[in-house]
């Protein structure tokens, strides 16, 4: 099996019985594509992230939607034209738009009804931004509910995603939903939570993903998401983990057995995009971290 990324070709041998064990058909995986996440660049001009992505050999951008760069209201007020220009200049597409929404001032799972409406209005505008940017997905995660009773929490979650899915359908856009670690949320931390939400809301424009830190800190594997979600698993966040927090580290600097996990992901049939998700831990050295992260992943391919 051939796996191509950023001009590098790696050979992986995946035994047929592994695929059969997962009940998946045989096929050739042609490409794993890597994205740069712009969050740690928030103290620098956004153009620096695009320039680095091009120079280091990334395949796409996952755009963090927060100030000063690409906060949804700012994009809709005119800033979007600059992001489109950067995509064209650097030949670097924005494939995922990830609005900031689990910290101040927005969390649709927490607060009063008026605060929920405010958060949803923001996310509805974010969906429009994702569509206008040309992104394939807008990424929505599920924040802390403030220990809301389970029934009320479930109703609020499903109500939120029905509204978002209806708007995405109107825009001809898609949403990818992310679980979080137990250090970030009091619910929605497992692949089964994702499947249950997708099944209950029932819109075909909703998909799931896996941030590999999430299963790792809970004694699970990323491949479990593919077994549970099947073809509805469309995106991946790669970062290493210390195993005891939500900290996202450079691949190879933590405890995740990346080579084995990547092997298993491919055996399960995942051949999509993978954003190397470095966040504020590397806010002082985003360029060096972005370069090191991709180099580390490529060494693991060899």
Question: Predicted regions span which residues?
Answer:
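Conserved alpha-helical segments that form or flank metal/cofactor-binding pockets of metalloenzymes
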Residues: 86, 95-97
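Active-site acidic/histidine proton-transfer and metal-coordination neighborhood
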Residues: 20-26, 48, 88-90, 106-207, ...
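Active-site-proximal loop/turn and secondary-structure-junction residues that shape catalytic pockets
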Residues: 40-42, 65-67, 100-103, 142-146, ...
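Residue-level detector of anion-binding/catalytic polar loops
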Residues: 59-60, 93, 136, 174, ...
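Conserved beta-strand positions in the central sheet of alpha/beta enzyme cores
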Residues: 62, 96, 139, 176, ...
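Glycine-rich, proline-tolerant flexible connector loops at the mouths of alpha/beta enzymes
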Residues: 64-84, 142-144, 148, 246
């Amino acid at each position: 099996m051939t796996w191509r990324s950023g001009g590098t070709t790696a050979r992986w041998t995946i035994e047929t019985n592994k695929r059969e064990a997962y009940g998946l058909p045989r096929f050739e995986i042609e490409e794993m594509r890597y994205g740069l996440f712009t969050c740690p660049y928030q103290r620098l001009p956004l153009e620096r992230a695009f320039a680095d992505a091009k120079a280091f050999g990334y395949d796409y951008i996952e755009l963090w939607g927060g100030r000063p760069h690409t906060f949804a209201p700012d994009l809709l007020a005119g800033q979007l034209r600059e992001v489109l220009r950067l995509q064209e200049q650097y030949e670097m597409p924005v494939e995922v738009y990830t609005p900031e929404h689990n910290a101040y001032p927005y969390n649709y799972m927490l607060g009063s009804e008026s605060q929920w409406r405010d958060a949803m209005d923001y996310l509805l505008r974010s969906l429009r931004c994702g569509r206008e940017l040309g992104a394939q997905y807008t990424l929505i995660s599920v924040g802390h509910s403030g220990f809301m009773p389970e029934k009320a929490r479930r109703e609020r979650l499903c109500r939120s995603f029905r509204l978002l899915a209806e708007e995405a359908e109107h825009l001809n856009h898609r949403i990818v939903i992310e679980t979080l670690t137990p250090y970030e949320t009091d619910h929605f931390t497992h692949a089964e939570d994702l499947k249950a939400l997708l099944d209950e809301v029932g819109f075909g424009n909703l998909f799931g993903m896996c941030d590999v830190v999430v299963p790792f800190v809970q004694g699970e594997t990323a491949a479990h998401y593919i077994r549970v979600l099947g073809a509805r698993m469309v995106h991946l966040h790669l970062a290493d983990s210390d195993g005891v927090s939500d900290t996202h580290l450079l691949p190879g600097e933590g405890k995740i057995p990346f080579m084995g996990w990547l092997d298993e992901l491919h055996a399960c049939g995942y051949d999509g995009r993978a954003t190397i998700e470095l966040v504020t831990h590397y806010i002082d050295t985003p360029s060096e971290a972005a370069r090191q992260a991709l180099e580390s992943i490529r060494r693991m391919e060899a």
